[in-house]
């Protein structure tokens, strides 16, 4: 999904998937296990990195059942949520170009959302 939070001193842009239900989370993890290179390309792309530094969200301490700790994308598989997040200053929120920043961030996030929802 897409999320815009506006609050003095605490505004941010986010989205992705926040604590998805177990069947969805399992489907996302299976997708990462099968095609984690694509997810890595998305979160390392220039467009994505223009707005977001990576993915935020809680992780399991150990791999979920059925996944090897040696899997090349195990750190992504251990995630419970998949959240891009960009903090915003109050001056950014009131800037005339703010709408363009939000639209740009949401466009940069779309490939991530597409990846997360494929197969759900």
Specify the residue positions occupied by each region the protein language model found.
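Soluble extramembrane domains of integral membrane proteins
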Residues: 1, 23, 41-59
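Aromatic- and glycine-enriched beta-alpha-beta binding-site module
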Residues: 1-33
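Long, solvent-exposed, polar/charged low-complexity segments
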Residues: 32-33, 45, 53-120
């Amino acid at each position: 999904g897409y999320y815009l939070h506006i609050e003095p001193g605490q505004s941010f842009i986010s989205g992705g998937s926040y604590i998805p239900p177990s069947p969805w989370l399992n489907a996302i993890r299976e997708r990462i296990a099968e095609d984690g290179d694509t997810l890595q390309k998305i979160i390392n792309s220039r467009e994505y990195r223009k707005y977001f530094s990576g993915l935020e969200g809680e992780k399991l301490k150990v791999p979920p059942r059925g996944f090897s700790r040696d899997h090349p994308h195990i750190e992504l598989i251990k995630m419970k949520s998949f959240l891009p997040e960009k903090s915003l200053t109050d001056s950014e929120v009131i800037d005339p170009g703010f709408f363009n920043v939000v639209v740009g961030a949401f466009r940069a996030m779309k490939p991530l959302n597409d990846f997360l929802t494929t197969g759900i």
